């Protein structure tokens, strides 16, 4: 996730299921975010096809896009954190076009994906790798009731800060 609003702003964007036809609009900011190396532990320099396979995972994964004035400005995906007996817990990933960061698009996607995960029957949501220096994402997830369960020290090689921790964050989606 590359974006978090500076306050409690939530953008007014259309969020819908993505199709592979959306990939040409997603890939430029996907590549910018991944190659920047500050928020995602993915290899730098993924080809268009490699990146598409990373983002568009097969069912039961769902991928969404946020649209503002006809332009794809963000994307998210949600699916099970584990197969089998762990499939009742969701995980998700989020990206917002860095040119549109700080406007609440990440918050809008976050709320949307939480609602979708709940409607799909997931009982909780867990993020396994929130970079601790990505403070806008950490703040956003905490505002959306995620708690930091643990921080894995020196698990992420940040291009400026060196070895930093990865937070495992969690929130319940059901009341039971």
How would you label these PLM feature ranges?
Residues 2-11, 94-95, 129, 152, ...:
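Terminal substrate-recognition subdomain of acyl/acetyltransferases
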Residues 13-26:
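A short beta-loop-alpha structural element at the N-terminal edge
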Residues 17, 39-99, 110-112, 116, ...:
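Acetyl-CoA-dependent GNAT
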Residues 26-30, 34, 48-51:
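Hydrophobic alpha-helical core bundles mediating ligand binding, dimerization, or RNAP-core interactions
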Residues 101, 127-137, 155-157:
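Conserved beta-strand-loop-alpha-helix junction that forms the acyl-donor binding cleft
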Residues 102-117, 139-143:
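Conserved acetyl-CoA-binding loop-helix of GNAT-fold acetyltransferases
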Residues 117-130:
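Conserved GNAT acetyl-CoA-binding A-motif
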Residues 142-152:
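Conserved acetyl-CoA-binding loop of GNAT-fold acetyltransferases
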């Amino acid at each position: 996730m590359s974006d978090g609003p500076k306050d409690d702003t939530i953008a007014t964007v259309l969020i819908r299921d993505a199709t592979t036809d959306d990939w040409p609009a997603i890939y430029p900011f996907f590549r910018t975010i991944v190659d920047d190396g500050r928020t995602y532990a993915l290899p730098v320099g993924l080809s268009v096809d490699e990146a598409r396979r990373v983002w568009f995972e097969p069912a039961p994964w769902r991928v969404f896009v946020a649209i503002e004035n006809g332009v794809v400005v963000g994307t998210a995906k949600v699916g099970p954190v584990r197969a089998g007996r762990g499939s009742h817990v969701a995980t998700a990933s989020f990206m917002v076009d860095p040119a549109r960061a700080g406007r609440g698009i990440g918050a809008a996607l976050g709320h949307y994906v939480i609602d979708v995960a709940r409607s799909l029957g997931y009982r909780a949501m867990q993020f396994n790798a929130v970079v601790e220096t990505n403070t806008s994402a950490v703040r956003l997830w905490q505002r959306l009731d995620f708690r930091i369960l643990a921080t894995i020290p020196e698990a992420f090689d940040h291009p400026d800060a060196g070895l930093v921790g990865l937070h495992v964050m969690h929130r319940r989606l059901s009341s039971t």
